[in-house]
Amino acid sequence: MGYLHDAFSLKGKTALVTGPGTGIGQGIAKALAGAGADIIGTSHTSSLSETQQLVEQEGRIFTSFTLDMSKPEAIKDSAAELFENRQIDILVNNAGIIHREKAEDFPEENWQHVLNVNLNSLFILTQLAGRHMLKRGHGKIINIASLLSFQGGILVPAYTASKHAVAGLTKSFANEWAASGIQVNAIAPGYISTANTKPIRDDEKRNEDILKRIPAGRWGQADDIGGTAVFLASRASDYVNGHILAVDGGWLSR
């Protein structure tokens, strides 16, 4: 079928994508399905029916699975059973939340909520996936980091802390597992038009300032992340380990 098909095809693979109901997660699920992967999508509150339809339009199988990422200890048993019963070749740790508040007023419960979803549950799922991938000698793990894995941000101390930690964990897992055939990498999306970023886009002055700094001159779309995910999930990235790949329209280069 040629180099492109051989290097990027995900035919016969199964990907677990957390939080694929909308936005970046949905774009990734659709792209992976388009490359040939079946998708297991996890959610606790969001409907996955639209994502299921998009995956099935690509001729792939979509399975939904309930996980409450805000309760890391509670997901251990159900997630462990999932990894035991299904061969998951690709894990995409996409689920994430953000709370905005001045640092001096940031509620402790919001701090813990963000860390549980964005970091603690990610660690548990990665550890569980890694155990099975180590036995098979291959696997792909893709974490969703952020520009705030590199920068400090404004009004988002918990989110920034969690995304810095995700970048560090990505490198740490990669250092231990790369020699066993498991690639652990992260995508750091720039300013992507999703529900999470709506408050920023609604702020006319801040939106204008952001657009001025992005060399591409526009906000990214969820589909802009999909191709990167296919690359990191495929054989084409077999020698890429512990990398935080910014997909940001050039933001970090300016």
Curated annotation (Swiss-Prot):
This is 2-dehydro-3-deoxy-D-gluconate 5-dehydrogenase. Induction: Induced by galacturonate and negatively regulated by the KdgR repressor. Is subject to catabolite repression by glucose involving the ccpA gene. The keyword Nucleus does not apply. Keywords: NAD, Oxidoreductase. GO terms for molecular function: 2-dehydro-3-deoxy-D-gluconate 5-dehydrogenase activity; 2-deoxy-D-gluconate 3-dehydrogenase activity; NAD binding; oxidoreductase activity, acting on the CH-OH group of donors, NAD or NADP as acceptor. It comes from the Bacteria. The gene is kduD. Its EC number is 1.1.1.127. InterPro entries: 2-deoxy-D-gluc_3_DH, NAD(P)-bd_dom_sf, Sc_DH/Rdtase_CS, SDR_fam. It comes from Bacillus subtilis (strain 168). Belongs to the short-chain dehydrogenases/reductases (SDR) family. Substrate binds at residue 146. The active site is at residue 159. Catalyzes the reduction of 2,5-diketo-3-deoxygluconate (DKII or 4,6-dihydroxy-2,5-dioxohexanoate) into 2-keto-3-deoxygluconate (KDG or 2-dehydro-3-deoxygluconate) with a concomitant oxidation of NADH. It is an enzyme of class 1 (oxidoreductase).
